[in-house]
């Protein structure tokens, strides 16, 4: 049986911490930043924990 392949899109978007939490980056931090306040862009810089409803599916895509 062939090896399972990791989902390329998922491996670019998510990472798993040492304790097993799935982290993601915030949206809206790529372009048109001069319109957004410094406070907003700072807040968007912080990584977020993925919703528990999505964790199982994401871990499967990452081959975990």
From Swiss-Prot:
Which superkingdom does the taxonomy of this entry point to? Bacteria
What PROSITE patterns does UniProt report for this protein, alphabetically? RIBOSOMAL_L35
Q: Which UniProt keywords apply?
A: Ribonucleoprotein, Ribosomal protein
MF terms (GO), sorted A to Z: structural constituent of ribosome
Q: Name one Pfam family in it.
A: Ribosomal_L35p
Q: What's in the GO CC field?
A: cytosolic large ribosomal subunit
Question: Which SUPFAM superfamilies does this entry report, sorted A to Z?
Answer: L35p-like
User: In the UniProt record, does the keyword Transmembrane occur?
Assistant: no
Q: Which InterPro entries match?
A: Ribosomal_bL35, Ribosomal_bL35-like, Ribosomal_bL35_CS, Ribosomal_bL35_sf
Q: Which GO terms describe its biological process?
A: translation
The UniProt entry's sequence similarity note says: Belongs to the bacterial ribosomal protein bL35 family.
Could you identify this protein by its name?
Answer: Large ribosomal subunit protein bL35
Organism, scientific name? Kineococcus radiotolerans (strain ATCC BAA-149 / DSM 14245 / SRS30216)
Its gene?
rpmI
């Amino acid at each position: 049986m062939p090896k399972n392949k990791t989902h390329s899109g998922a491996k670019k978007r998510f990472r798993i911490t040492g304790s097993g939490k799935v982290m993601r980056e915030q949206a809206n931090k790529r372009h048109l930043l001069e319109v957004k306040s410094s406070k907003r862009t700072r807040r968007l810089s912080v990584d977020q924990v993925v919703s528990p409803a999505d964790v199982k599916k994401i871990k499967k895509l990452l081959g975990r």
